[in-house]
Swiss-Prot record:
PROSITE patterns: DAGK. Keywords: ATP-binding, Cytoplasm, Kinase, Lipid biosynthesis, Lipid metabolism, Magnesium, Metal-binding, Nucleotide-binding, Phospholipid biosynthesis, Phospholipid metabolism, Transferase. InterPro entries: ATP-NAD_kinase_N, Diacylglycerol/lipid_kinase, Diacylglycerol_kinase_cat_dom, Lip_kinase_YegS, Lipid_Phosphate_FormReg, NAD/diacylglycerol_kinase_sf, YegS/DAGK_C. Its EC number is 2.7.1.-. This is Probable lipid kinase YegS. It comes from Shigella dysenteriae serotype 1 (strain Sd197). Probably phosphorylates lipids; the in vivo substrate is unknown. The active site is at E271. ATP binds at T40, G66, D67, G68, T69, I70, N71, E72, T95. Residues 2-133 form the DAGKc domain.
Length: 299
């Protein structure tokens, strides 16, 4: 086997008892690969481990977890200064794994790990909210955000992405749309949004294709709004094709400004952010990520 530079795996603490992962790491180590492993316990650990990775001189920092772990690691990487910043590798171990699934990361741990170490590093975009918080996949607001935020951890652990749908049906009678105004390049809309998706990536909420035209290296954010006054009719209408659906508003821009008369919540790769004003902008070619050669989210 060809020699590869060292990697550091930042593993979400919930995945420490994953026996197949342990076996995959040991096998690659036996084949001569150097893989350091660090486990996160609390917020901020990923940033410290990325700094350690730079001191070790590794070529890749692998995010082992779900969308939240990928977000935390990628955010730490784009905040690094200087040269020789490691590439991002992805090892999907979360509940939904929306970003990993949409970019074509293999489900098999051994194949995903090899790709994370030896795959081609491609420059991709990230997005930033209010000059502070970042996301690599998607910002979602409205009905979908409240569902993903409120779904019990035990339900997610047992059922995975399906848990979001089940919890949503249970809560349907209490959910209301978010009234807001959204501006972008050659875009303006004001009204009631049941679901709002602003995507660098394409899917969220356990496999829902909210922004099916998004690409991660085109310098643009894709916006999709599901409008309507009542939850159930609007959700049923999402089963129609886009051409026949009057409840879908779409736009594309390198930035979007969102204003609301009341506090609303956006879910940024699994992390909630509440407020009345949001400025969301793309950060072109913000980091390098090891992706499969047939990744569908590259232009």
């Amino acid at each position: 086997m060809a020699e590869f530079p060292a990697s550091l795996l930042i593993l979400n603490g919930k995945s420490t008892d994953n026996l197949p992962l342990r076996e995959a790491i040991m096998l690659l180590r036996e084949e001569g690969m150097t893989i350091h492993v660090r486990v996160t316990w609390e917020k901020g650990d990923a940033a410290r481990y990325v700094e350690e990775a730079r001191k070790l001189g590794v070529a890749t920092v692998i995010a082992g977890g779900g969308d939240g772990t990928i977000n935390e690691v990628s955010t730490a990487l784009i905040q690094c200064e200087g040269d020789d910043i490691p590439a991002l590798g992805i090892l999907p171990l979360g509940t939904a794994n929306d970003f990993a699934t949409s970019v074509g990361i293999p489900e098999a741990l051994d194949k995903a790990l090899k790709l994370a170490i030896a795959g081609n590093a491609i420059a991709i975009d990230m997005a930033q909210v209010n000059k502070q918080t970042c996301f690599i996949n998607m910002a979602t607001g409205g009905f979908g955000t409240r569902i993903t935020t409120e779904t019990p951890e035990k339900l997610k652990a047992a059922l995975g992405g399906v848990s979001y749908i089940i919890h949503g049906l249970m809560r349907m009678d209490t959910l209301q749309p978010d009234r807001c105004e959204i501006r972008g390049e050659n875009f303006h809309w004001q009204g009631d949004g049941l679901v709002i998706g602003i995507g660098n990536g394409r899917q969220a909420g356990g496999g829902q294709q909210l922004c099916p035209n998004a690409l991660i290296n085109d310098g643009l954010l894709q916006l999709r709004i599901f409008t309507g006054d009542e939850i159930l009719p609007a959700l049923v209408s999402t089963l129609k094709s886009d051409e026949d659906n009057p409840n879908i508003i779409e736009g594309a821009s390198s930035w979007f400004d969102i204003q609301a008369p009341h506090e609303i919540t956006f879910n940024l790769d699994g992390e909630p952010l509440s407020g009345q004003n949001f400025h969301i902008e793309i950060l072109p070619a913000a980091l390098r990520c090891r992706l499969p050669p047939d990744c569908p989210l590259l232009r």
